[in-house]
């Protein structure tokens, strides 16, 4: 990456969060109970041990986790909670397009990429955020890095197909370990 491109990545990944916070936080702390959710790619544990592509991209992926920790310190005195949440292997529109499938036939992509079997819909991470927002004791998660799969176990919600994909555990234990794709015990 060029310096110009790398700095642009960081501006989009970090500055936008800081600018949003500058204007949103006064509203958020007007009364206790606010929630800030930084969405990123990868848990703190995973990202601590895995370098991502180049220095700019790597920083962009870890920055929201650190922002959540920083926001937690700044917002806690106002009764607000800040966390970072990562979806698993997200079955987004771009991923479906990349594999030439739709949400209805997404499993066909597993012929090209067998580990895609652990993927989840965007609704799954949305349900994670909704469950967290509805939790009156959500401050127990203050400053933490969470995953949609981990929160599904905690709160009992499922993805659209009724499963609970635990993608980050799968990535570590199966995909990164070089094992054949098998989502048994991970969905």
Language-model features, listed with the residues they occupy:
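Catalytic loop of short-chain dehydrogenase/reductase
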Residues: 3, 29, 34-77, 88-90, ...
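C-terminal helical subdomain
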Residues: 84, 105-187
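Rossmann-like NAD(H)/NADP(H) cofactor-binding core
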Residues: 37, 78-83, 144
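A short, exposed helix-loop element centered on a Lys and neighboring polar residues
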Residues: 21-22, 69
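Catalytic Tyr-X3-Lys loop
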Residues: 1-19, 37, 64
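A glycine/serine/threonine-rich, flexible loop-to-helix segment
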Residues: 77, 89-115
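Conserved catalytic Lys-bearing alpha helix of Rossmann-like short-chain dehydrogenase/reductases
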Residues: 14-17, 59-68, 82, 125
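Short aromatic-enriched loop/helix-cap "lid" or pocket-rim segments at secondary-structure transitions
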Residues: 50-51, 94-98, 155-160
């Amino acid at each position: 990456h060029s310096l110009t491109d790398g700095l642009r990545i960081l501006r989009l990944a970090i500055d936008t969060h800081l600018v949003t916070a500058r204007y949103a936080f006064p509203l958020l702390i007007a009364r206790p109970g606010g929630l800030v959710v930084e969405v990123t790619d990868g848990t703190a544990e995973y990202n601590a041990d895995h370098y991502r592509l180049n220095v700019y991209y790597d920083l962009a992926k870890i920055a929201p986790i650190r922002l959540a920790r920083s926001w937690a310190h700044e917002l806690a005195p106002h009764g607000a909670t800040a966390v970072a949440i990562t979806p698993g292997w997200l079955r987004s529109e771009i991923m479906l397009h990349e594999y030439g499938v739709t949400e209805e036939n997404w499993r066909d992509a597993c012929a090209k990429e067998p580990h895609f079997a652990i993927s989840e819909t965007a609704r799954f991470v949305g349900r994670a955020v909704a469950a967290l927002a509805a939790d009156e004791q959500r401050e127990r998660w203050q400053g933490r890095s969470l995953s949609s799969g981990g929160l599904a176990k905690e709160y009992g919600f499922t993805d659209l197909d009724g499963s609970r994909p635990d993608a980050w555990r799968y990535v570590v234990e199966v995909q990164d370990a070089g094992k054949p794709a098998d989502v048994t015990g991970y969905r």
